Every structure is written in C-alpha cells, then in structure tokens.
Amino acid sequence: MARPSVCLLASLSALLLGIAAVSRSKGLRGTESQREPRIPSQFSQEQRIAMKEALKGAIQIPTVSFSPKELNTTALAEFGEYIRKVFPTVFHTSFIRHEVVGNYSHLFTIKGSDPSMQPYILLAHIDVVPAPDKGWDVPPFSGLERDGFIYGRGTLDNKNYLMAILQALELLLIRNYIPRRSFFIALGHDEEISGINGAQKISALLQARGVQLAFVVDEGSFILDGFIPYLKKPFAMVSVSEKGAINLMLQVNTTTGHSSAPPKETSIGILAAAVSRLEQTPMPNMFGSGPLMTAVEQLANEFPFPTNIVLNNLWLFRPLVSRLMERNYITNSLVRTTTALTMFNAGVKVNVIPPVAEAIINFRLHPAQTVQEVLKLAKDIVADDRIQFHVLDAFDPLPISPSDDQALGYQLLRQTIHSVFPEVNIVAPGTCIGNTDSRHYLNLTTGIYRFNPIYLQPQDFSSIHGINEKISVQAYETQVKFVFEFIQNGDTDEETVPHLHEL
C-alpha cells in the first residue's frame, strides 16, 4: 500500500458499522449455484512447503520503488521470470492469456466457460518500499523463516497477496479447475509511487477493449484483532471507499547572504512558521458528514452502556463523540482530512543564509471534502503571501462502493470470510485511509473493495513500511486458502437469497 497506506485504519468505521448481534441480510447462493462440484481447499504437506518457499523467493527479489524516476528495474524483470518459473501451470494454460504492460506489470486474462457472467479483477502489486537494514532482526530481503514467521519487506505489503493469488490459481489449475466466470489478475509494478505506469496502463488497456468489471478486489483492510476497546473478538473490515490525497510543496524564496549578518527572517524561519500553523490548525472535524453518522445511529444499541446511550443521542452528544474521535490518531484520520509534514529541505552551508526553503505536506482527504476545498483551507491557515503553493499531485476521495445485499463483490468477500475464518462473525464496510492501485479502475466498475485476508494486530501495523515486517507461515497458507475459495465462489450466480445470520 502506498505511502504509508494501510487501510486497516478505518477501524472506527468497522466498529460502528459492524458490531451487530443479529444481522438481517441477504447472501449469495452458495454451493447450490455451482454447476460443478467444489474443489476442497486442502493442501498436501508438499504443497504447503512449496507455497511458503515460493513466497520466500519472492521476498528475496528487492523490487524497490524509490521514486517515480528510480525503480529497481533489474529486480522487476527478475520477478517476472521468477513467477514464470514458480507457477508454470498459470503460464501454460490454454484459457489464460498473459501480457506484460508498461514493461514490468503483468495482466492475466482467465477466460471462463460462461460468457454471460460479468468478469472481475484481482489486484496486487510487485513493488515494495525501501527497507534499510538498520533495526531489522534479519536482512529485510532475506526471506528468512524464524519461529514460524517469514521475514522481509513485502510479507504484508503486498507480495503475500500477490503470491497467494497466483499460488491459489496454480493449485486450482492442477486440479483441472475451469472457471465459469472470467476474471483478470493485474500485478502492478509501481503502486508505491502512484501506479501511473502499471495499474493506470492496465486499466486503460482494459477500457480500450471494452471491458466492464463486476467488481475489483485489491489490498487494503484486514481482519483486525485488538484494535477496538470492548471488542474482544476479531472482525473483518472491507474498505468500500478510499481517501483522496494532495502532495503540496510550500516554497519560500529570499535573498541569500552571510550568516554573520542575518535578516530578521530567513527562508527557513518563514517556512517553519507556516508549517507550524498547518500542524497546529487541523482541518475541520467532518463527523456527521457522509455515512458514518447514519451508521452510528443504526448500531448504537449494539454497544455496551454507557456508549449506547451516547450514540443513541447524537443530537446531544455529537460534539463529545467528535472530540473523543480526535484523541486517537487512528480515529482522528476517519473524521477529518489529515495533515502530515513529510519532507523539509533547506540550506547549503552552515554560514550561508539559504535562498530557498521547501516543505512537502501530505494531505489525506476526508470523503466529504475535495482537493480545491482543502487547498483553500490550507492557504487560509498559512495566510502568508511569501509562501508559494505548488501542487505536486492530487486526487479527490473515491466514491463509496455498494455493500448492500445486491453488491456481488462485497457479498462474495463476506461469504468467503465466513467460510475461511468461521471464528470471525463481523464483516463491516469501512474507509481506506491510504491509497491503492484500485483507484485507477474507477472507469471500469462501481464496485471496488479492499481486503487482505489475514489477521492484523496493533503491533503488526507499525511493521508495514517499517521494521521487521513479517507474516506467519500459517497466515500465508490461510491466505492462499482464501483466494482458492474466493475464485470458486466467484462462479456463483448473482442471485441472492434472504437468510438470518446470527453473530
């Protein structure tokens, strides 16, 4: 996930949207809709060893994206050869077409037997963020296994999901699986630097071919364990939206000179004051805008006392709830556009007044705001004509995808979660606070869902784009199992039947 883009953290959305003791819903027709017997998601010991070794090998290839102009293209090319070697059946099946897009991204077209069924697409990305050796218990690109965990950059973001998709398909194919519903697999090579040459080009290619997708599934949320107070059981969050983003450069130009006779204000001082004002003046709290307010009102009775009383009377307690959400950096990101100073550059020598100072601010936009609204607010907060504003890149928040009974992609995820993780009773829609490749597919579908089928605990979160990123062997095997079942569930008819689901 890009920059630091773990979608996990619409946890409050999940809390508010998902804690229900009894949920009245509709579910997809299950086995009765399948025209062929299901292939059981059971793997031999030999297959389980092979799948973990395949992941280790993928981690050992340092497919790092440093910047849009600096990628490890040698590693990206090597990775393409690696997946050909590890998943030979995928590359040599007659109804699968493989294409390289943008030099290093990969598009697989898996042709189903029923052309009347609308196809879907599974997304993952090849590239990873840099990983300096310092602080790691093992080298970050070693793929070493220790105490049941595989360590390395990409084990959670996002080679685990990429390899699980291809591994599951490989295992299905060797058991003579032929899908009813066509689907695509798109592996982008530059997601960590916005996906312009990978996902964007794949999307454009599909659009040129007239493809319209039933839904998209990408990385994003997780099964969250231990994130929500008073919630002892884990819950699954499927992100149905994604925040927007602005990378804004603030620049100050002044006259240079010798430090022995400094001016009253230097470029650094002027810029530092402006940045400080932005940090000390958060964007407005938007609690009450969008679906979050409605979710709180609908689910208030599912919370223990006294929370249920507070949430049932938002006409009175709304300011209190808003303030409480601001106290935690996770929930704060759900109620407002966040402001993060990520880069500051100035100075050429210790005794020279710097002529230029630059800072880059990363805004993550609340779904109720637009790029233009946030830029105007930022200019009003800075309130200094000496500060130049340069928008490096920006995009508005993504639309909210449906999560109702007729939303095929969401219901397929929900069905598969309950099958593979029977201990997880709660599946809730949420918002992705990071940015993913899925935003490039808006022109192909209205259903975009972000879910990574593994457990995540608070201590795991900091390792994503951080130190000692790792995944348990068991978790990876379960991830393969999830994709294995999801692909088969995708062959189900789009009809739905009502049922009462007790949690």
Swiss-Prot record:
This is N-fatty-acyl-amino acid synthase/hydrolase PM20D1. Secreted enzyme that regulates the endogenous N-fatty acyl amino acid (NAAs) tissue and circulating levels by functioning as a bidirectional NAA synthase/hydrolase. It condenses free fatty acids and free amino acids to generate NAAs and bidirectionally catalyzes the reverse hydrolysis reaction. Some of these NAAs stimulate oxidative metabolism via mitochondrial uncoupling, increasing energy expenditure in a UPC1-independent manner. Thereby, this secreted protein may indirectly regulate whole body energy expenditure. One of its GO terms (cellular component) is extracellular space. Keywords: Glycoprotein, Hydrolase, Lipid metabolism, Lyase, Metal-binding, Protease, Secreted, Signal, Zinc. The lineage of its organism: Eukaryota, Metazoa, Chordata, Craniata, Vertebrata. Its cofactor is Zn(2+). It comes from the Eukaryota. Binds 2 Zn(2+) ions per subunit. InterPro entries: Bact_exopeptidase_dim_dom, Pept_M20A, Peptidase_M20, Peptidase_M20_dimer. It catalyses: an N-acyl-L-amino acid + H2O = an L-alpha-amino acid + a carboxylate; an N-acyl-aromatic L-alpha-amino acid + H2O = an aromatic L-alpha-amino acid + a carboxylate; N-(5Z,8Z,11Z,14Z)-eicosatetraenoyl-glycine + H2O = (5Z,8Z,11Z,14Z)-eicosatetraenoate + glycine; N-hexadecanoyl-L-phenylalanine + H2O = hexadecanoate + L-phenylalanine. Pathway: Amino-acid metabolism; Energy metabolism; electron transfer; Lipid metabolism; fatty acid metabolism. Residues 1-25 form the signal peptide. Zn(2+) 2 binds at H125, D157, D218. It is found in: Secreted. Zn(2+) 1 binds at D157, E192, H465. Belongs to the peptidase M20A family. Lipoproteins are powerful coactivators of PM20D1 activity in vitro and NAA biosynthesis in vivo. Its main location: secreted. GO terms for biological process: adaptive thermogenesis; amide biosynthetic process; amide catabolic process; amino acid metabolic process; energy homeostasis; fatty acid metabolic process; lipid metabolic process; proteolysis. Its EC number is 3.5.1.114, 3.5.1.14. GO terms for molecular function: aminoacylase activity; hydrolase activity, acting on carbon-nitrogen (but not peptide) bonds, in linear amides; lyase activity; metal ion binding; peptidase activity. The active site is at D127, E191 (proton acceptor). Glycans are attached at N72.
